[in-house]
């Protein structure tokens, strides 16, 4: 035996790695690339990992992924896709209040259980009214009541099959001439459970199931398409009415109170106060205003990067905190204003403080890959907000274009001059609305096509689950418990270690992630 080898038992295991407290109390500002998590013991499969996380004090998601309120990232299409895959999207506010509220309404109407406020027409309405409703709402399975309003007697229903082959000159016909009459409809009585109603809908093979009371008055309706969505997207984020969850961004100015009212009417579940520096009297006053006027509406404050900033917003009553300043791929706040903080340090410091008050943290910015998501969650964040990682997906706003044979979509920071020129809301976010000379805190660029959210997000989910498996944790709750107890260990990486951890030593390679 070589003289340096020692024989004996395996009971001795040296202390290895650093605790999170040791890692982040060294005085250096760290980014996600500056450290690694040391692996643990595996006794379960990756698909057993539970990714359930708190977005706010009262909203829980099955997937810890959130899309950023940027005008090149999140409108209704993105918010719907994120909610269906278990996360949530925040509609940007670099637009008119009416446009933003309508985007929220599209999300809330996309999937429902009992629809208690459907589009309703009367027998004397015309075929062209159905086509207008279809263009406005995206569907045409419309119940017909004697007065054209909910709560009145059901007399029929109009579906696409009734109008598909009508000629232009027939668009002035009355609906009573072509609708499916009441006696031919399958209906369910008021008081039926959602499960029972879905079973009736399945057996009937109809597209819509009207719910009527003893007087045959319409009280609700259920759609077959929603039943199929419920089957296809088991992780979907929904409210108590079985509608998809949706968030929206607002500012902290007086005119944002009007925007807030429209969003509340549209059914928004949570608002994020969109500011690059959230520790301001303006945001504190807005938090108090919202909590007083809409006590059940969840409010996310931010952005913050220190415990001192977080304290003021927690005292004001926020339900969650958004953490990050200058770490986004299109953000130049740190470069231009010399303010901010490396993102990993910011997430750990704020999360460690906010957890004492039961306030979840959203890690916002600096996410370049699935490993960064796993690190943010391991440092105490409950969810991760993504901008560039979701930009250029099919569901992101904007049109694709080609450059040098590569398919791209535009992506810009909300602090870029490009975004500020589009709408005043971007200037408000950076306190620049009154400035004669605008100081850009972001840039405009382009991002390569990533395909659909419905393929990309499942890849992210699987990556997080495999990361938790390597750590030896069956849930994100366990990951954070291990981190705070000191059981989870970290290690700093030198620049050479970072090179070693990436692809190296190859003449050429193709990097396919999924």
Swiss-Prot record:
Catalyses: IMP + NAD(+) + H2O = XMP + NADH + H(+)
Which residues are K(+)-binding?
326, 328, 331, 500-502
Q: Which residues form the CBS domain?
A: 114-173, 179-237
Q: Which residues carry this modification: Phosphotyrosine?
A: 400
SMART domains to which the protein is assigned, alphabetical = CBS, IMPDH
Subcellular location(s): the record lists: Cytoplasm; Nucleus; Cytoplasm, Cytosol
Q: Where in the sequence is Phosphoserine found? A: 122, 160, 416
Q: How does it assemble?
A: Homotetramer. Interacts with CLOCK; in a circadian manner. Interacts with ANKRD9; leading to its ubiquitination and degradation by the proteasome.
Could you identify this protein by its name? Inosine-5'-monophosphate dehydrogenase 2
Protein species of origin? Rattus norvegicus
């Amino acid at each position: 035996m070589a003289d340096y080898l020692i024989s004996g038992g395996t009971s001795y295991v040296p202390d290895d790695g650093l605790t999170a407290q040791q890692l982040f109390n060294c005085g250096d500002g760290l980014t996600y690339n500056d450290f690694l998590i040391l692996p643990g013991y595996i006794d379960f499969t990756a698909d057993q990992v539970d990714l359930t996380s708190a977005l706010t004090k009262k909203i829980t998601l099955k997937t810890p992924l959130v899309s950023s309120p940027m005008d090149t990232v999140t409108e209704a299409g993105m918010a719907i896709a994120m909610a269906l895959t278990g996360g949530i999207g925040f509609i940007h506010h670099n637009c008119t209040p009416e446009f933003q509220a309508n985007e929220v309404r599209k999300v809330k109407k996309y999937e429902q259980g009992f629809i208690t406020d459907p589009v309703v027409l009367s027998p004397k309405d015309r075929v062209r009214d159905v086509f207008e409703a279809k263009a406005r709402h995206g569907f045409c399975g419309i119940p017909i009541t004697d007065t054209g309003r909910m709560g009145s007697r059901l007399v029929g229903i109009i579906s696409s099959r009734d109008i598909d082959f009508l000629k232009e000159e027939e668009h002035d016909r009355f609906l009573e001439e072509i609708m499916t009459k009441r006696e031919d409809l399958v209906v369910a009585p008021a008081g039926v459970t959602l499960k029972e109603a879905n079973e009736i809908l399945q057996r009937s093979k109809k597209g819509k199931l009207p719910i009527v009371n003893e007087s045959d008055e319409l009280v609700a309706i259920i759609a077959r398409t929603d039943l199929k969505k419920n089957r296809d997207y088991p992780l979907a984020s929904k409210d108590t009415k079985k509608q998809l969850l949706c968030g929206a961004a607002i500012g902290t100015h007086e005119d944002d109170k009007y925007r807030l009212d429209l969003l509340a009417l549209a059914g928004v579940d949570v608002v994020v106060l969109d500011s690059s520096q959230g520790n301001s009297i303006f945001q504190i006053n807005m938090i108090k205003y919202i909590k007083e006027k809409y006590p059940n509406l969840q409010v996310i404050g931010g952005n913050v990067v220190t415990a001192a900033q977080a304290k003021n917003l927690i005292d004001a009553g926020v339900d969650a905190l958004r953490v990050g300043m200058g770490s986004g791929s299109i953000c130049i706040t740190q470069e231009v204003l010399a303010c901010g903080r490396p993102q990993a340090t910011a997430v750990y410091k704020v999360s460690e403080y906010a957890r004492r008050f039961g306030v979840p943290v959203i890690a916002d910015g600096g996410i370049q890959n699935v490993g960064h998501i796993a690190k943010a969650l391991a440092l105490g964040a409950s969810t991760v907000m993504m901008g560039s990682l979701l930009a250029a997906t099919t569901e992101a706003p904007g049109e694709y274009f080609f450059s040098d044979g590569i398919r791209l979509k535009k992506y810009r920071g909300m602090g870029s001059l490009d975004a500020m020129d589009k709408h005043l809301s971007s200037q408000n976010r950076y306190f620049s609305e009154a400035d004669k000379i605008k100081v850009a805190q972001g840039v405009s660029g382009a991002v390569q096509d990533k395909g659909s959210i419905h393929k990309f997000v499942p890849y992210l989910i699987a990556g997080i689950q495999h990361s938790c498996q390597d750590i030896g944790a069956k849930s994100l709750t366990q990951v954070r418990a291990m981190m705070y107890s000191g059981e989870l260990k970290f290690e700093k990486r030198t620049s050479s270690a970072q090179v070693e951890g990436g692809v190296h030593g190859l003449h050429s390679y193709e990097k396919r992630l999924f």
